[in-house]
């Protein structure tokens, strides 16, 4: 099998953002004159991979009052996760973290051998010590330009309901994926204990999170933050569509409208792009692996969430991506 923990390059022809083709310049979203506090986001730093730790070291705020969302997959080892979040917390006025699947892996090289929910609890306590906001903390409110907005960090996992074509159930979906050589590394390294399955853990998190969301002031705008996409559509551009099984849950398909979101921030897919669903902006903010970002050369590491970046015409590529689509990438996409 491909051991498909991650997808490679998107198929750009599948979806257009309406933004036109991209130019070669990096466009600043800050106005001329005094810089304003900004809510930034990034995900999938994967600092354990050679070449990615310098990326984390390059991240700096534009003002002393900037906040940073870190939307999961910082690293696999607990010491690497601590190093990165501590570095960022010392630079940004507030850091908001949600776990990805990689933080929940327990590998033989990890100095902390805890599994499943106990591992998540360990990471939450670690963040608490550093002053990093997690899904278990009170939701912070952004009151600078673009606000007020409640920032809602979530840990939801997935329940195998993003089914590939030809599958009607989880078991059928896993069989289709296996036939095509696609098996997520999560199946070997991500423990769900004490839950019987990952989908059971997901369903428990959904109930917990919905209750907190239902208690919010429905008039207050929100920024929904989850490692996995809240809707299925972003998965449509993956080279290996079967990987969608490990990418989210259909239970959240209307949360961006139900809970008054002005933006939904996610990562996981390693396809940094901006799209709109039901008029709501979705920002995939991942860095990805060195072999990916070195090839496509993203415009910038940090993504502006608030104030609304108001992307200039031509800034996004022809499917909403934050990188130039090279002829080689187009040629590869035509093979799928």
What are these regions (language model features)?
Residues 36, 130, 236, 242-260, ...:
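Binuclear metal-dependent phosphoesterase catalytic core
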Residues 24-97, 103-109, 195:
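N-terminal active-site segment of His-dependent metallophosphoesterases
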Residues 51-55, 74-89, 102-129, 143-146, ...:
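Metal-dependent catalytic neighborhoods of phosphoester/phosphodiester hydrolases
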Residues 66, 93, 147-148, 219-221:
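Short coil/turn segments at beta-strand junctions that form active-site/ligand-binding loops
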Residues 41-43, 68-73, 96-101, 133-138, ...:
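Active-site neighborhood of phospho(di)ester-bond hydrolases with catalytic His/Asp-centered motifs
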Residues 1-23:
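Rieske [2Fe-2S] iron-sulfur-binding domain
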Residues 150-223, 230-239, 334:
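Active-site-proximal loop/helix segment associated with metal-binding centers of metalloenzymes
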Residues 31-40, 139-153, 276-281:
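Beta-strand-turn-beta hairpins that frame and shape the catalytic cleft
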């Amino acid at each position: 099998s491909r051991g498909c923990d991650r997808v490679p390059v998107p198929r750009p022809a599948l979806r257009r953002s309406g933004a036109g083709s991209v130019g070669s310049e990096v466009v600043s979203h800050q106005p001329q004159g005094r810089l304003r506090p900004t809510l930034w986001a990034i995900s999938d730093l994967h600092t354990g991979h050679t070449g990615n730790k310098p990326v984390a070291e390059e991240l700096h705020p534009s003002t002393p009052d900037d906040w940073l969302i870190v939307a999961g997959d910082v690293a696999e080892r607990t010491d690497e996760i601590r190093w990165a979040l501590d570095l960022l917390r010392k630079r940004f006025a507030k850091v908001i973290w949600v776990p990805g699947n990689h933080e929940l892996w327990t590998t033989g090289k990890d100095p902390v051998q805890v599994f499943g929910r106990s591992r998540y609890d360990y990471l939450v306590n670690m963040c608490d010590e550093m002053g990093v906001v997690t899904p278990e903390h009170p939701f912070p409110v952004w009151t600078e330009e673009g606000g007020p907005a409640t920032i809602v960090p979530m840990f939801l996992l997935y329940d195998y309901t993003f089914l590939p074509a030809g599958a009607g159930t989880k078991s059928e979906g896993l069989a289709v994926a296996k036939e095509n050589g696609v098996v997520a590394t999560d199946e070997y390294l991500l423990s769900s204990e004490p839950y019987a399955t990952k989908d059971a853990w997901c369903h428990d998190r959904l109930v917990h999170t919905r209750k907190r969301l239902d208690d919010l002031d429905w008039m207050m705008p929100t920024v929904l933050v989850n490692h996995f996409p809240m809707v299925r559509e972003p998965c449509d551009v993956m080279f290996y569509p079967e990987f969608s099984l490990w990418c989210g849950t259909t239970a959240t398909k209307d949360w961006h409208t139900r809970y008054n979101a002005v933006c939904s921030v996610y990562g996981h897919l390693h396809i940094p792009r901006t799209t709109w669903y039901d008029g709501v902006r979705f920002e995939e903010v991942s860095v990805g692996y060195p072999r990916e970002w070195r090839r496509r050369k993203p415009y910038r590491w940090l993504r502006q969430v608030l104030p609304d970046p108001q992307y200039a015409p031509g800034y996004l590529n022809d499917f909403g991506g934050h990188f130039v689509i090279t002829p080689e990438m187009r040629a590869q996409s035509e093979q799928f």
